[in-house]
């Protein structure tokens, strides 16, 4: 995965007026916090921030923050968007050590839809969790969890215990929760009802 580097500058002042002035200057205001240090108001050039954001690798990934010659590992915790233009208007970054154990949401994706027995029979994939919260070192955050649907039949339940996680990564919750299931569609159920009648 390519490393994302955000070049930031420190903002003077805080509050709504300061944030608006920052946006008028073509930058996105943000706050850097965590790591046992005081919060710092920062800003990133809007085009640079959008480029990093829309790669899909900013949220939930380790990012290098650069201020002059100084570098800091951070995780983007939140990005706020304008309700009409959908442009980023504010972001929060959290300082982390590369090997620090953190909890983070990771997206779930599914593969081999075409080889799933249940889906071939007309079943549907019901996704319960589109993201899963994982506990892992900051430098080992998986980009995604990929779940193989091959061999899953109607009625099968896919739990977190069935997912092979990378070394050093575990679910943040200590229970075997459901991620998805393959269920019979209403059409498949009515076909089954017609054949039994």
Swiss-Prot record:
It holds the Pfam family Ribosomal_TL5_C. GO terms for cellular component: cytosolic large ribosomal subunit. SUPFAM superfamilies: Ribosomal protein L25-like. One of its GO terms (molecular function) is structural constituent of ribosome. Keywords: Ribonucleoprotein, Ribosomal protein, RNA-binding, rRNA-binding. The keyword Ribosomal protein applies. The keyword Ribosomal protein applies. It comes from the Bacteria. Part of the 50S ribosomal subunit; part of the 5S rRNA/L5/L18/L25 subcomplex. Contacts the 5S rRNA. Binds to the 5S rRNA independently of L5 and L18. This is one of the proteins that binds to the 5S RNA in the ribosome where it forms part of the central protuberance. HAMAP family: Ribosomal_bL25_CTC. Belongs to the bacterial ribosomal protein bL25 family. CTC subfamily. This is Large ribosomal subunit protein bL25. It comes from Caulobacter vibrioides (strain NA1000 / CB15N).
């Amino acid at each position: 995965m390519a490393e994302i580097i955000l070049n930031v500058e420190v903002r003077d002042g805080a509050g709504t007026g300061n944030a608006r002035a920052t946006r008028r200057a073509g930058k996105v205001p943000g706050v850097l916090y965590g790591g046992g240090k005081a919060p710092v108001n920062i800003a990133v050039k809007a085009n640079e921030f959008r480029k990093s954001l829309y790669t899909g690798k900013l949220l939930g990934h380790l990012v290098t923050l650069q201020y002059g010659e100084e570098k800091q590992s951070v995780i983007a915790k939140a990005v706020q968007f304008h309700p009409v233009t959908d442009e980023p208007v504010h972001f929060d970054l959290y300082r982390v050590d590369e090997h620090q154990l953190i909890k983070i949401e990771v997206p779930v994706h599914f593969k081999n839809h075409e080889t799933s027995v249940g889906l071939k029979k007309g079943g549907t994939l019901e996704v319960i969790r589109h993201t899963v919260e994982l506990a892992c070192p900051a430098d080992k955050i998986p980009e995604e969890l990929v779940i193989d649907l091959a061999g899953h039949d109607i009625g099968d339940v896919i739990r977190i215990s069935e997912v092979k996680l990378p070394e050093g990564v575990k679910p943040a919750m200590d229970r075997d929760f459901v991620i998805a299931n393959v269920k019979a569609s209403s059409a498949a159920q009515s076909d089954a009802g017609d054949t039994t009648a």
